[in-house]
Amino acid sequence: MKPMPDQTDILPATADPIPAELLELLSEPRLVVEPGVAARVAAVAGPVLHGMGYRLVRIKVSGELGCTVQIMAERPDGTMLIEDCEAISKALSPVLDVADPIDKAYRLEVSSPGIDRPLVRRSDFERYAGYLVKIDMAVPHQGRKRFRGILGGIEGDAVHLQREGVRGDDDPAVLLTIEDISDARLVLTDELIAESMRRGKIAEREMKQNLGILPPPPPHAKKSDPTKSNAPKPKAAKAKSKVAKTPPKNTKEHRLAAERLRRGDIDPPEGD
């Protein structure tokens, strides 16, 4: 493997400066990271993505059918389009060739994190609070290494989780220390798919507006916040009305009675 060059010498030049409001999100460190060869790739890819306005999510090096390096990336708001993946691949390929973090031939794949994405930053655990997740621990918590349940956000340096399928007297609520987590990811649900589609449409619309393909929205239009979580909320119980409902007056029974009354068969019922 070649010596790692200075990152400042191999970063691609960006066309536009990164807006100040995005710098904080771009600079947020990952709390769940990969070891070994993937860590060497991350040391090269991370600064490149940051300079382009993207965040590194996860790197996976697979040896099946040859060596494949998969790089997951995203915009600061969590969205990712095909055009973003193409731009990253084009900029990152020559940088990896120079840095050479892998000592054999490999195939580079750049992708979005996916709908059932890994959670690697503090903001990820906060953004997807209310959704179903599964978490694997590097260090067991109360004798367990695998957990599944509804994410409750961050409490200090730990993740709050409301576990599913708890039996007996076990407390469903647990706090899992973030630095002890080896893998955390969302579980595919209908609510998660709907939320992902919403964010994707917003990102695509903004890209078309920036390219001049789509006219800008009117000044009075309400702007959606793609960083806001739209997790499903508990349904409130409907209060029962105490007002007595008026019984119907035009049922089949009433019509038959009216016909018999017209023929003089019976007297009209009281109140009709």
Swiss-Prot record:
What do the Gene Ontology cellular component annotations say?
cytosol
Q: Which Pfam families match?
A: DUF150_C, RimP_N
Ranges annotated as biased composition (Basic and acidic residues):
250-266
Q: What is the annotated localization of this protein?
A: Cytoplasm
Please state the protein's primary subcellular location: cytoplasm
Q: Which NCBIfam families match?
A: PRK00092.2-5, PRK00092.2-6
**The protein's role, per its UniProt record:** Required for maturation of 30S ribosomal subunits.
Q: What is this protein called?
A: Ribosome maturation factor RimP
Name the gene behind this protein.
rimP
